[in-house]
Design a protein with these regions (language model features):
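Expand to "…catalyze enediolate/carbanion chemistry for C-C bond making/breaking, isomerization
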Residues: 1-169
Length: 169
């Protein structure tokens, strides 16, 4: 993988999908904060090497800095989706992630994430999106107050909120 191409592909996904309001989502964008983060250059894309090692070292030695999200990209076939999601789950439960209030959101092309017929996966790479859990919760709370989660499937939302507090409460 070439970093410039990966960055371009992810930026196109953000512009053409993640930031775009969708009728099946109540005319909300899949991530209402993505456009702002992209425009203000508050995200970083990195080529991942080893998902477990990358996340462990991030939790131990690195910081979010000005970024709202740090995205690690891996070739889609480097990991099967079960193992990839298992590692992301293990890291979310790790002492390092809890101590630093980090959350890792996995996106593997073979794990279909769909709501109301809208498929959320990036599709080309296996991604780990790292965010500050407190900041994410505060943004999600504001969205909940505005009705963002109204009409979403409860089972899907429970999966989304697995490693964080439900902002609707």
């Amino acid at each position: 993988m070439v970093i410039d191409q990966v960055k371009k592909d992810i930026e196109e996904w953000l512009i053409n999908f993640v930031e775009v309001p969708h009728p099946a989502l109540g005319n909300w964008a899949p991530c209402p904060y993505a456009r702002r983060a992209r425009k203000l250059n508050q995200y970083s894309v990195r080529l991942g090497d080893d998902v477990e090692r990358d996340l462990f070292l991030f939790a131990k030695k690195q910081y979010m800095g000005k970024n709202d999200v740090i995205i690690y990209a891996y070739p889609a076939k480097q990991y099967d989706d079960a193992y990839f999601n298992f590692i992301v789950d293990v890291m979310n439960n790790s002492k390092g992630f809890k101590k630093r209030n980090l959350i890792a959101l996995g996106d593997h092309p073979d794990t279909i994430e769909e709501h109301n017929g809208v498929r959320f996966n990036m599709g080309k790479y296996a991604l780990v999106l790292l965010q500050d859990k407190v900041k994410l919760h505060n943004h999600a709370k504001l969205l909940a107050l505005k009705g963002y989660y109204d009409g979403w499937d409860e089972e899907y939302l429970q999966d989304v909120f697995t490693h964080r507090r439900d902002p609707r409460l």
